[in-house]
Amino acid sequence: MALKSFNPITPSLRELVQVDRTSLWKGRPFKALTKGISKTGGRNNQGRITSWQRGGGHKRLYRVIDFKRNKLDISAIVERIEYDPNRTAFIALIKYEDGEHAYILAPQKLVVGDKIISSKDADIKIGNCLPLRYIPIGTTLHNVEMKVGKGGQIARSAGTSVDLVGKDSGYAQIKLKSGEFRLVPLDCMATIGTVSNPDQKNINLGKAGRNRWLGWRPHVRGVAMNPVDHPHGGGEGKTSGGRHPVTPWGFPTKGKKTRKNKRTSKFIIKKRK
């Protein structure tokens, strides 16, 4: 997909850069694979704000994506490639030989009419899904499971992928885009290829209102608040905070490591950069 810029006939169009989506499906989503999704506005079940700067945004339909790809040894045809407002990647509607439909993450270079399959005997071809045990070292993958049967969790965002760099003692070694090397059980499923829409990282929203459409509210700096609202607040005139950057609750931020899950640290061979 190419990027699209605009003539500056309005101020917001001057900086606007979008992904050209003219080749995507222009109709409604497949109704049987959609369901309603309610907005939280950043509030939890007690009505308290747990995620700042969230709220509003355009109403969305949730597309049910098959991250497990566990319909084995039945080939499917790609019927169309669609936009999904709930994620940065594009999605593909596929139809199996038995008539069942499903949405999957669309990898790059997958086109309408392609035939894909989930099977341990599948060819190493874009869109096919196999257990890591049967994938050759050096293959580029996405939608990789971390637990057998749980569904893909690694490399699902636009333009992302992982590299299979080794196999040993029942585990596959994968290299993530972050530079992290990780162990994953060999029976976990993974899909061949890189996730679609790699130009997502180059877009420019052009105006604040476009962020509001996506459900993001203004981000207020701590130094612009009062002392009652933030540790950086207050002071006479414009002050720079006077301490190392912290969250509204006083915890160090901007680079402070927050990973707490020591239980799975044994699966990380090399930490991310």
UniProtKB/Swiss-Prot annotation:
The Gene Ontology biological process terms listed for this entry are: translation
Q: Name the residue ranges with Basic residues bias.
A: 254-273
Q: Where is this region: Disordered?
A: 228-273
Reading the lineage from the top rank, the first entry is Bacteria
Q: Does the keyword Repeat apply?
A: no
SS bond list? none
* Record's keyword annotation contains Translocase: no
A single GO cellular-component term on record: large ribosomal subunit
What the entry lists under SMART domains is as follows: Ribosomal_L2 (SM01383), Ribosomal_L2_C (SM01382)
Which PANTHER family does the annotation name? LARGE RIBOSOMAL SUBUNIT PROTEIN UL2M, RIBOSOMAL PROTEIN L2
Give the protein name, as stated in the record: Large ribosomal subunit protein uL2
Please name the source species. Answer: Rickettsia bellii (strain OSU 85-389)
Q: Gene that codes for this?
A: rplB
